[in-house]
């Protein structure tokens, strides 16, 4: 079971980290004294940009796969689409939350209020996911829209390989709640203790989710454990918190302190790395034949793609720093021979 759980974590990690980043941005905007409406517009606009990138990515994949990819692939709800929509939803919630914080002048800990609102939304999305995939399906809307709710696509049934709001956006809201917790005054004063509590809480959630799933009486009549179960959601949130704690240990006392860190470098160019690696792993220029390699060959392929993406990331960082110099070179007047 543990290996299967770990295999489901990349997408939750994307959304979880997007939520943490969103909390940092929202807190900075709030500290600048921006009104709630402007905070909402700024963050929602950024979410719309990510959604637009997701749609552009689908167009690119369709063009690359021209001749055998169906047109419906253009409307697939992929992970970038999910991140964009989740950011739009978080922007709406934070606009409301900041308005509440400003309206109620007695609130002394606004980050706590915003974090609790985010955690509550995560719980609501997770608890509604089994229903939105079954008895509460919005069948009355066109499938391209319903697909953002439950991943139905054009196949008349929710698909496990898509990333709809239910349940995936819940991970972004968990990240949002965790982000506000990490920004609190207490967490900043007791940094190591905060991450230790996060790790311990994560382990507790893992075992709580497993215990709840083992009970003879369940809340839902029909449920898909690996895709919509709130119990599995708790398990994955537990793993995310454990990974967050491990990342802190790595950056505070691990090899990341010795200088260059490949993981930090990849994280600084994560969108580019994601965009490019898809073609090498899943696309037409895949470095390995699909469904036809053993574990050793797949592992070697993983190592190869890791170093290739690391090189690409380093090149991107180098070119980014030299952008003014490169633009100046192109703008130089041509000398007569």
Predicted regions located by residue number:
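Alpha-helical transmembrane segments and their immediate juxtamembrane cytosolic regions
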Residues: 1-337
């Amino acid at each position: 079971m543990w290996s299967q759980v770990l295999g489901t974590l990349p997408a939750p990690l994307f959304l979880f980290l997007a939520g943490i980043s969103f909390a940092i941005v929202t807190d900075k905007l709030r500290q600048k004294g921006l009104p709630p409406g402007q905070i909402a517009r700024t963050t929602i606009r950024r979410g719309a940009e990510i959604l637009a990138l997701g749609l552009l990515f689908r167009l690119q994949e369709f063009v690359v796969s021209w001749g055998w990819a169906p047109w419906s692939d253009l409307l697939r709800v992929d992970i970038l689409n999910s991140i964009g929509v989740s950011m739009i939803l978080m922007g709406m919630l934070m606009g409301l939350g900041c308005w509440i914080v400003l309206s109620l002048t007695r609130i002394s800990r606004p980050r706590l209020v915003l974090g609790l609102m985010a955690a509550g939304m995560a719980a609501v999305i997770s608890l509604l996911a089994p229903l939105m995939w079954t008895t509460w399906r919005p069948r009355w809307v066109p499938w391209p829209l319903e697909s953002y709710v439950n991943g139905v696509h054009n196949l008349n049934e929710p698909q496990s390989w898509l990333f709809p709001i239910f349940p995936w956006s819940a991970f972004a809201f968990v990240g949002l709640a965790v982000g506000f917790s990490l920004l609190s005054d207490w967490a900043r004063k007791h940094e190591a203790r905060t991450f230790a509590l996060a790790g311990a809480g994560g382990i507790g959630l893992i075992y709580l989710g497993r215990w709840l799933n083992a009970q003879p009486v369940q809340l839902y009549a029909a449920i898909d454990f690996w895709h919509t179960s709130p119990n599995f959601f708790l398990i994955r949130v537990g793993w995310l918190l454990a990974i967050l704690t491990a990342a802190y240990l790595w950056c505070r006392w691990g090899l990341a302190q010795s200088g260059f860190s490949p993981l930090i470098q990849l994280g600084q160019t994560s969108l580019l790395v994601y965009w490019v690696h898809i073609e090498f792993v899943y696309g037409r220029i895949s470095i390995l034949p699909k469904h036809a390699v053993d574990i050793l060959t797949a592992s070697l392929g993983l190592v190869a793609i890791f170093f290739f993406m690391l090189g690409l990331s380093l090149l991107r960082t180098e070119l980014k720093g030299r952008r003014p110099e490169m633009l100046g070179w192109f703008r130089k007047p041509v000398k007569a021979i």
